[in-house]
């Protein structure tokens, strides 16, 4: 149900989303050149503020005070990082931002499952929702922990590749565990609806396996190749966010 913007016509919501999309597209275009990249970041950030702000206010997801408080905290942290982080350390910061995006997507998908499988939720969830949530948990877990390791390697904490006997077998085992947990989630095997504390254990098994897999995938790679890894994880962060949108049916 519409919240604070209840007096506005439904078309206003569509126009706000359209404006956000235009800001995103223009921001991405500006990011293609170093001279305009700063403006591109500003346009993209403005698009995100419009999209998130309109959504949470229109559907009463958060109160305006909570929304503005979150914006202030985020702006303060971002400003502090912009001032204190050296230009040469920007790749590490970008890697951390990628990881936070993937981790946030995994948490949002988990929250959606809590809402679906809680005591007041449905006994059967749409398969498209559980499939998207499983994809989000897998990609988000790999992205978050892989990005943390990549940022640490770029920072020089552990630059050399780490190899150990049976590393490929171990990676395959955790990937297989994540896939099995995802299948259990999608087919809704072993889901308990008794209380909010026993919902969908398979999702968190999937996230845990994906998190370990993200670490195992990055530690054998040398520090010199971390920019490539971070670029790949950046794309994965976007995929996780897109999958979260499908999980939320938005």
Q: What residue spans do the PLM features occupy?
A:
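N-terminal transmembrane signal-anchor/hairpin module of polytopic inner-membrane proteins
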Residues: 1-64
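Structural signature of hydrophobic alpha-helical transmembrane segments
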Residues: 7-21, 58-76, 129-144, 196-209
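Hydrophobic core segments of alpha-helical transmembrane domains in multi-pass membrane transport
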Residues: 17-28, 48-55, 72-81, 108, ...
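C-terminal ends of transmembrane helices
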Residues: 22-36, 75-94, 147-161, 213-226
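Cytoplasmic-side transmembrane-helix entry/capping segments in multi-pass membrane proteins
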Residues: 38-47, 67-70, 89-101, 162-173, ...
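Generic transmembrane alpha-helix signature in multi-pass membrane proteins
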Residues: 54-58, 80-84, 94-95, 103-115, ...
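Transmembrane alpha-helix boundary signature
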Residues: 55-68, 80-91, 106-124, 187-195
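Structural signal for the N-terminal portions of transmembrane helices
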Residues: 67, 121-141, 240-250
